[in-house]
Amino acid sequence: MEVTVMTQSAVSVEHTKDTTDLFILKHKDLDVAMMKMDVRTGMIEYILSVYLPEELPAGCAPDGTGLGEWWKLRAIPDSRQGIRQVLSRLSEATSQSLMLSSYGLSLADHYWIQPVGQELYWKDLNFYENDFGDELGDILTDSERERSVSDGISKLSPSVSVNGDMKKKWIIRGGRRYLLKVNPSYHSQQAVNEVIAGKLHERLGWKNYVSYEVGTIHISGRKYPCSLSPMFTSVETEFVSAYQIVAAYKVPNDVSLYEALIQQAVSLGADEKEVRAFLEYMILTDFILTNTDRHLNNFGFIYDPRQHRLSGMAPLFDTGNSLFYDYDVIPHGGNLLDIPVNSFSKREADQLHYVKSDAGVKLERLVHFPEEAEALLREYTDMTDERAAETARTIEEKIEYLNLFFQGKKIWKKERYW
């Protein structure tokens, strides 16, 4: 489908940064902390006072330590292609200062910052209940449409508080919020990989995942595939990343990061059985798809801010960096057991150490799944048919390796030691 976005009437209040360098961190309408900020760079310089330690973002100490890192991770990373040019065009020094123009509002949680001396309210600003314009999102994804000079560019957008290297923006379609992601490089495969992951979860009967669809976006006069996924937070719930759970925790030398995360999550209200089942399923399905980028900000928990506890696992999302999208030569055979990843382990196969059950990954349900993935790659990307077939073959091989693993083979070792 082709993405067409109706221009929404944006929230009318936009922050001007020439009034004060003192800001209040807000959680909806609660005053959480007072901060001094560098309004040019958008960076938090120091915390003046913490009023409600229990309302601080997860991962921050009661005295506010960690707020600076939390704020930085909320912004568009410097590593995102084209962000320097966007900032220059908008006369912003950093992506943090761009975020400051939008009060730090997000569609992941209910935090924002209020300039001291201004009387503002959550109900009037938040992007859950208030529409927002699309022009800044267009710039961030290189998908600008013809606009009148008089239209201007509103910086008040949730698109400025979405991290990750892939270009993305929030859009409104039929009253619902969707995250659109695009990368014209690598055959635009990342967008299609998200849909393939959804087909995998569907076959396995797994319910807790974000459903992606493939759309089309115009960039420099050409059409490219993009992915569209609905928002999974709400005015009642927030997303807390796994990284936030362990950010302020010193992991003992005799405890793995995997176990430390589970322990910390349980201490914050999560159900241990649910967490373990989710993580094992995630490791197994990421293995099938060779998802190399399941770092601690790419999965997490749903947080209930009223009860101050984790209420469950956030749905699985962000499987775009998989299926050898950025490999020139696709590996096969034993080389598939030596894949470097950015996750609990440095090597993909080593993560199977943590898996104690099949976690609902019934391999017999995946008959013809490789062919389904191949068909999607052929339909939506411009890769050759040969590469699509070769990519699908890695799925077949990974399923065969998991079958051996379920039979008790220690496939992370050299084959002679299985």
Task: Give, region by region, the residue ranges found by the protein language model.
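Glycine-rich phosphate-binding P-loop
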Residues: 291-292
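Canonical protein kinase catalytic loop motif
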Residues: 295-300
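Phosphate/dinucleotide-binding and metal-coordinating scaffold of catalytic cores
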Residues: 1-284, 288, 301-418
